[in-house]
Amino acid sequence: MKSEEKIKLVSIVGPTASGKTELAVRLAERFDGEIVNADSMQVYRGMDIGTAKPSVSLRSRVTHHLIDIVTPDVNFSASDFRRAADGAIADIHSRGKRVFIVGGTGLYIRALLQGLVDSPSGDEQIRGELNELAKEIGNEGLLQLLAEVDPITAERLHHNDRVRIIRALEVYRQTGRPMSQFRQEHGFAEEMYDCLMLGINVERQELYSRVEKRVDEMVESGLAAEVEELFRLGYARDLKAMRSIGYKEICSFLSGEISLDQAVQLIKRDTRRYAKRQMTWFNKEYGIKWVEYPAAFANICNHVIEFFERGEDHAKSTFQHPGSVP
């Protein structure tokens, strides 16, 4: 497909609490657009506070897509996201609106823009066996097993990232080939859309201060009550969605394993670490234009105008790359 035939997107990325949603709403209002969510947790219904979903007032200003589309017991994957996002983008474009993608889930952004690794579909039996094995040898034991057959993928993963460790082992057991080989063959080279990627750069201590404030606000807004309601609806704490940051710690609090203060401190710590991992991911991605927000909003608007009118090359020239979050 020729570049001029591709739908133009503006994708806003960056770490949690960096101000992505606010910037996306302001740009969508300015350019008559709609927003497609690319946050892996905001797709879940009933998980509002802990996922920092856009407020009702923000969503009333601009139409948002792919929020509250599945229940917490659904394992919503990057491929599921890509299919849903492709549909939302086509719908928005067909009505003559601009498309803005916003979210901090790097894999979702990559899947949308460059496609996914052509690896085999999941095998529930193998996955179940690996989950049982994890109970015996722990996450570190699983990672060691992966290192023996796929050291490249093992090097990329943290031992607590059980889902991806099991997925890589699952692929190897199915095919006899390491996941890293599938990734190398794919190359993440296919460009699906014409996209201007804007990354919000926030100074480290300021970002961490925002993280702590956001967590305090979540707790004050009723995060524990939200988790209690999820329990009441029958969603168990071992679900993938319930093991995410904020929910797993409150589950431990409600089960009497830790105090509320301990839960809050753990959420803050884990969110800071998550923000650091997000920045590491996005710093390695090609073509992100890093901006200061809200200070440079007028400049951002000018570059978005140039991108929509003339293409990406002219728009990319004056953006600078940030340093990593230490």
From Swiss-Prot:
UniProt-listed Gene3D superfamilies: 1.10.20.140, P-loop containing nucleotide triphosphate hydrolases (3.40.50.300)
Known partners and oligomeric status: Monomer.
Protein name: tRNA dimethylallyltransferase 2
Entry binding sites for ATP: 14-21
Record site: Interaction with substrate tRNA: 105, 127
Catalyzed reactions: adenosine(37) in tRNA + dimethylallyl diphosphate = N(6)-dimethylallyladenosine(37) in tRNA + diphosphate
Biological process (GO), any one: tRNA modification
Family (UniProt): Belongs to the IPP transferase family.
Keywords: ATP-binding, Magnesium, Nucleotide-binding, Transferase, tRNA processing
EC number: 2.5.1.75
EC class name: transferase
Record-linked NCBIfam families: miaA
Cofactor(s) recorded in Swiss-Prot or TrEMBL: Mg(2+)
Region (Interaction with substrate tRNA): 39-42
Function: Catalyzes the transfer of a dimethylallyl group onto the adenine at position 37 in tRNAs that read codons beginning with uridine, leading to the formation of N6-(dimethylallyl)adenosine (i(6)A).
Record GO terms (molecular function): ATP binding; tRNA dimethylallyltransferase activity
